[in-house]
Amino acid sequence: MDLAPTSPQAQARALTVLGLESSCDETAAAILRREVDGSVTVLADRVLGQNDAHAPFGGVVPEIAARAHAEAMDGLVSQALAEAGLAVADLDGIAATSGPGLIGGVMAALMTAKGLALGAGKPLIAVNHLEGHALSPRISEPLAFPYLLLLVSGGHTQLLIAEGVGVYHRLGSTMDDAAGEAFDKTAKVMGLGFPGGPALERCAQSGDATRFALPVPLKGKPGCDFSFAGLKTAARQIWDGLDAPSDQDRADLSACVQAAIARALSSRTRRALAMFVDRFPDASRPMALVVAGGVAANKAVRAALEDEAAAAGFRLVAPPMKWCTDNAAMIALVGLEKLARGQIDGLDAPARARWPLDGAAAKSDPAIGSGRKGPKA
């Protein structure tokens, strides 16, 4: 991909950034290099998952995750540097997820980055994890601003307009649970294993997506907000009402839940596509609908969104599967973008459990995306 030079300093020399990620249950380190002509190369990309540690509990246990991040991070950094053939002294900056996420996990990447930056005298770039997902397709292909972004994962479901690095306008957000939460919790109820989303998708392959009637969240309601709590509850009630459920019952309910989530995402995205066209009538065609985050790896969701995009004259853009879930390559990319603009942070940069991607969300009253736990990132 190419990053357009943004300053004389950015054009003068190549930049190499180490990115670190530990916001949930993947520990990751990656190194990206930006050449003078704007092209970007992934020099190293390491990810260590924690599925085996969390599987007995059916979900991510924050304390276990934080401990695993702390134990793994130094080794992954060493592996990434060795893979790239570099030393810390060769880097131009250290980027790390600073939030949002599980605070104990976030601190593992951020504190490691601070130590490296201080010891080597390198700039620190504190990265919003959500911006990493927002820009992740740009790791592998040119993607011009503005574009419509559907950010969909286990913790977030948002529709935003991406107008530039650090410039985002939210059109809608979940009012309760994220789409990935509905996937994961339904999978847990049916005993499909962890992680739940991919397990449910595999189970759905042999299921009948028309067998069970599930509600379409916010059907007919204006706006671009989402709601998945009711769908999650309805799926559980259907499961609890089955007498000695069979493997086929599991497959059918998995297929129905997957189809309902895909319909909900595509119907709200349809509204956002129209709003994007109204806002940018002169944008170059075809315009881009970007889907990013862990749920972007779901093939049924991608297919539904591809249909919506094509009907509206957009092209669907998604990162490669390996960069849909949490990774450090996207963190390093944001680090490159910000470093090229001279946007660096002090060693007092905080770890944040919540950090809205769009500044207006944190100031709105009531907060955009408010739910049972308050303003969501």
Curated annotation (Swiss-Prot):
Cofactor comment: Binds 1 Fe(2+) ion per subunit.
EC numbers, comma separated: 2.3.1.234
Pfam family, one: TsaD
Single GO biological process annotation from the record: tRNA threonylcarbamoyladenosine modification
CDD domains, sorted: ASKHA_NBD_TsaD_bac
Gene3D superfamilies: 3.30.420.40
Cellular location(s): Cytoplasm
Known catalytic reactions: L-threonylcarbamoyladenylate + adenosine(37) in tRNA = N(6)-L-threonylcarbamoyladenosine(37) in tRNA + AMP + H(+)
Region (Disordered): 358-377
Residues holding Fe cation: 129, 133, 326
Principal subcellular localization: cytoplasm
A GO MF label: iron ion binding
Obligatory cofactor(s): Fe(2+)
Superkingdom as given in the UniProt entry: Bacteria
Entry binding sites for substrate: 151-155, 184, 197, 298
GO cellular component: cytoplasm
Alphabetized HAMAP family for the sequence: TsaD
Job of this protein: Required for the formation of a threonylcarbamoyl group on adenosine at position 37 (t(6)A37) in tRNAs that read codons beginning with adenine. Is involved in the transfer of the threonylcarbamoyl moiety of threonylcarbamoyl-AMP (TC-AMP) to the N6 group of A37, together with TsaE and TsaB. TsaD likely plays a direct catalytic role in this reaction.
Family: Belongs to the KAE1 / TsaD family.
Protein name, entry field: tRNA N6-adenosine threonylcarbamoyltransferase
Gene designation: tsaD
